[in-house]
Amino acid sequence: MNTYFEEDFGKFLWEIGNFIRDKGLQFDPGLYCATTVAVLSLKHTCSDVKTIIESFERDETRGAIMIYVDYYTELQVFAAKYGREVLEYGMKNMDLNEYCNWRKLGDPDNYQYLNNLILGLHHVQSGDLYIEYGCGRGNGIINAASKGITSYGVDINIQHVIVTEIKAFWKKIAITVECVNMDENGTCEYGATKSTVDTGFMRNNYNFDTLMENKYLQPYKAVIKKAGIRIWGQAIIAYQKNKTGRVIALTFPAALFNNSDKGIRKTLVNQGLIEGIIELPNGTINGTNVKPVVIIISKENYDGVKIMDATDLFKKTGRTVTIEPLQIENIIEMYDQCKDRCRMVSVSEIASCDYVLSANRYFEKNKIVEGIALKDICDIERGTSIRSGELKKMVSEEPTKYQYLMLQDIVDGKIVNQLPYLKEIDRKYSSAILKNEDIVISKLVPFKICLVHIDDEREILANGNLFRITVNKAKMNPIYVMLYLRSQQGQQELARYVNGAVMRAISIKDLKQVKIPRMEMEEQNKMAEKYKQFMVRLEKIDLERERILADISELL
């Protein structure tokens, strides 16, 4: 890449962007349309520019660019400041929208490398007909076409289609792009040999009824739910339309674990149609910190599903992930050969995990060989969610024996002293009332875990972001359980059951599955006694610290 050209082209884009806003015109696809006219103006007359625009295939593209011919002279002035060489370089080599996206979270080159990963997993070759459903602004199909692959793009957003056609014009690459809804019957019957579904990370920006009317989904109507993620239905449609029946779908983690999609996951796993799952790190895709997930659909995968954890295989700085070509090659090799961070998970093992396909369920850094599930030794309840208006009515200005515990009240593994007082606690909330030596654990990551110390007269009500764990003391010492959950191994065990793309959390159902290593009760009790001794020492240190701080405050 030419750094000098990039800097100048970036300055040019900011000027064009401000020009578009000042005119009250649409930024997308206006940025591409205005830039196209500006660059052409350096070499062609206004009349010639109109002729070139007429060569575009789509009426919508021609119309969108023609708007800016009215500003030919003004755009020519902008372009002349930077020169044809710089601007043509930018149009051929840079993604305009990404370059101007000041909120970007990742490396702009990640798009191309992610496309290369998908194409590499497809093993595209000469003679393939490749189609991308939800082609967006065309990065994927243009990348495929540049490798000599016949490429089709489909997107429901006409702005995306216009930008894709303009990009292909400047890169001198032949592609076909359609503005249609892949969910509808009779669309996209191209006879592709390889296809990708990348229809965005939104759950509900589509018509569920239209999707379910598709003829290819009729056998699956009973297991595809409206509350689920559409990628499963669309992947099936694409799979049925393919000549070879191989599809790669890009989605987000909820598709692998949410209860709404359990039925379709179970059906596809048992039919041998899910070949593999690859989880990539948060921040891989520009503009979102959501973790991308690759789902590979093909036939006759009766041995199980390849599941790969690639979340820590890329370089990450803060929220920015940088992908390098060698890393892409390594991921493809690991997946194809099912080695290192990729393993074949049997159908029976997936069934035992309730058809959750998240990688953290199947990769254990410190596997607990002899363990017992929390559900077998504990009573676990979620705290209560009380509306703010109702909670205000419950709060007491005067001290009472009733108090309320929130997430922020757990600091350094202890409950703070000054909890809000309540007038009383309705018995309908009894399951959320904490008892002495109960364990409290937060629902959200990072986990806050503490042991409750309370006399019999007081009652503390836990809120909805917390779980109450009451350990059967005949089976395990609650202090041992608490210490294990806080430990590195315990945190890794909890992490296996964490779900969520942005808000990482554990459900009560999954918390009950967390395993605790077995230990002789005598050893547990010894550990608990040592813990109590350490806590007494810490309390003395805290008191001394308070005295010292008080003395410091009196120095003046």
Predicted regions and their residues:
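Conserved S-adenosyl-L-methionine
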Residues: K104-N204, F252-P253, I264, N270
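DNA target-recognition patches
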Residues: N205-E213, L391-D426
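Flexible, glycine-/basic-rich loop-and-beta segments that form/coincide
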Residues: G287-E370
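A short glycine-rich beta-alpha junction/loop motif
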Residues: I295, N360, E459-F467, V498-K526, ...
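Non-catalytic DNA-recognition/assembly elements of restriction-modification systems
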Residues: D336-P399, V411-K414, R518-L556
